[in-house]
Regions:
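Conserved acetyl-CoA-binding loop-helix of GNAT-fold acetyltransferases
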Residues: 152, 156, 162-176, 194-200
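N-terminal charged segments
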Residues: 1-90, 106, 110-127
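Conserved beta-hairpin
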Residues: 125-140
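C-terminal "cap" of GNAT-fold acetyltransferases
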Residues: 94-102, 211-219
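Conserved GNAT acetyl-CoA-binding A-motif
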Residues: 49-52, 148, 177-189, 209
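Catalytic phosphate/metal-binding cores of nucleic-acid and nucleotide-processing enzymes, i.e., regions
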Residues: 112-113, 147, 210-212
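A conserved beta-strand-loop-helix scaffold within acyl/acetyltransferase catalytic domains
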Residues: 137-150, 154-157
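Conserved beta-strand-loop-alpha-helix junction that forms the acyl-donor binding cleft
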Residues: 185-195, 199, 204, 211-217
């Protein structure tokens, strides 16, 4: 188990990763406190995993053998952690990040005021400070998610898919984040079209992530 960032914060780990400074690829696991009551889960980097949870670190370590670096993102461990913390593990997402861009987005956007929109309503369960914009055929939103990082989600209307709009929306998010901060994307690996769109928009793979949600917290 790693003690190099044991007493650090998840926000610091993410900020360093966005700048290309990843945890050491040594096959170890770092256990950090959950950054908020909402946020709990596992992030897997290259040969290094970060578990952020309110569970006792000793409990976590006892269930992660040193000779299995893939164990933290295994269904068995995620289920055990979820049961222990009264949370539910969901899908394992591909985690990508991109630096911000100056100037205006390359597509015309207008604020989307309808917070009842399903994509926006869902985002507000998992993120703070959610902001959304619409263009013809699509929607892009940003919000502060895990450890207050800026996260992006996009939606392309079915009739407008296959024409590069997803890439344009993902690229627009890089212009929309304030304070010149990086923007993160959680992408279902099976959604190949979304993966291609974000990669084409300049997002780079950083790792994989599984979040554990708590029904009592509304997430």
């Amino acid at each position: 188990m790693s003690d190099q960032i044991e007493h650090g914060l998840l926000a610091t780990v993410l900020r360093d990763a966005a700048a290309g400074r990843f945890p050491p690829a040594n096959g170890e696991v770092t256990v950090l406190p959950a950054p908020s009551p909402r946020d709990s889960g596992v992030i897997g980097f290259t040969a290094h995993a970060v578990v952020f949870t309110d569970a006792d670190p000793a409990w976590v370590r006892a269930r992660l053998p040193d000779d299995d670096p893939s164990r933290p993102l295994s269904p068995a461990f995620l289920q055990a952690l979820g049961t222990h913390t009264h949370r539910e593990a969901h899908i394992i997402d591909m985690l990508c990040v991109a630096p911000p861009r100056s100037g205006q987005p390359g597509i015309v956007l207008r604020p989307e005021p309808d917070i009842a929109h399903p994509r926006i309503a869902r985002a507000m369960r998992y993120r703070d400070d959610v902001r959304a914009w619409r263009t013809d055929g699509g929607l892009v939103l940003i919000g502060r998610g895990v450890a207050s990082r800026w996260e992006v989600a996009i939606e392309v209307d079915p009739g407008c898919r296959g024409h590069g709009l997803g890439r344009a929306l993902a690229s627009a998010a890089r212009h929309l984040v304030p304070d010149e901060e990086p923007v993160w994307a959680q992408i279902a690996p099976a959604n190949a079209a979304s993966v291609r769109a974000f990669l084409a928009a300049g997002f780079q793979p950083a790792g994989a992530e599984a979040l554990l949600t708590h029904s009592e917290l509304g997430v």
